[in-house]
Amino acid sequence: VKVNIVEKGQIFFAAAFTTPPKVSAVGTASSQKIAAFSVGSRLASLDEGILNSLLGGLLGTTVSLKLMDYQGLVAADVNALHVVEALAIDLKLTAGTYKDVLKTEITYGQFLNALTKTTGLQPAVANILKTLEKTANKSNIKLKLEEILNLGPSSDKLIGSGENLKVTAGVFDLLNAAAVAGNGGNQLALNLNANVLGLASVKATLAIGEPPIETPSLAVGGQGTIVRTAQTRLAVNVVVDGLQAIAGLKVNIPLYVEVAHAEARLADIRCTGGGQGTVDVEVVPGVAEIALGNADTSAFANFGKDPRVTKAAIVDSALLAINGSALINATNMTKTKLTFTQSDITQAKIKSISTKDTVTTLVSSLLKNLNLDIRLLFLNLDLGGLAGIQAALANTLAVVTAPVDQLLYNVLLVLGVKIGEADVRVTDVRCQQPALVQ
């Protein structure tokens, strides 16, 4: 707020031959209102094999954590501001600002080491991170913390003067966000053969878009600050064999999933007294395109261009040929306003939104829209004609619907992505008293 005061001055000795001058003063006062908030999706179920494959793929090494390890990491929270402070000690930047640390390039191992020494972390969780750190030291990926954390106006403060701001983040979310940032948008090839029960083989190609540095999934800022999840493309090729319903023929299920980033915008902060406040956040979930078909992965990581998806050979043998394709979309782009009271903020309560047409069972939804071309190449093959073949194929695919759904769900959630949904939480709000700044 800028205030300009003008008053008529007083003169004494010169009052007989001149008029009194006008005297003015200008002052500017500022009242800063900020909040710490994040967007993402918390893992509700865990698959040890998928998690190890994906994290290992991002790091370019082999990860062998146990299910209990992941459960501990998912359950743990940490103050990201304290992570920066721990890293500042390691980097000998304690006399600098938070921005100095955020902009310094570090290895993934250095990040994990700082995470283990962060104030408030449970010893059991720190031990898990130390185990992962030994593996990460074999990786050569590097990152800058500004790629996963935006501290806004707090960036210019000296290390240790963060005024106990609660920038709460999940430990699992942080280590995965750092792995994605360090990977630099490279395309990943994952072989999940032994990890998904009931499927002969599973191969996946994954590409993760790089969000602008100013909009990571965790931030501190005032009205208008934006956080986003990663834009993600996933092509999965599932093979099921030995299925008697269609004469023991091998069935190929190629799936393509593209999820746009979910976005949360700090819409308003209303101060309620005593430094407390209520925060409004506008959220748009990550909409998706899901297809059954062959996706061209040659330029998968180029998010400026849509990959071509063509009809796929679901069954290809000397006896029978079945080609098919399907496409579904979750396309609701309506903003949803979430309001966080002071009680919600104190408890770091997670609130969720979803599209009106959320895809809850991806594969079964695709099968309802499946277009098939069936060619019976061996006339004596008795499958009851075209209707019988369609029924046999439907029964075969129904068997693998649940494990493939679980596969897609887990791979995307590791990246903080849930199709058509988003989880948001506000963990601190500051309503500072007006102060003269000029």
Predicted ranges, named:
Residues 62, 91, 115, 119, ...:
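Sec/Tat-exported extracytoplasmic proteins
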Residues 33-121:
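Charged, amphipathic alpha-helical linkers/stalks
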Residues 10, 60, 79, 107, ...:
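Helix N-terminus capping/helix-initiation residues
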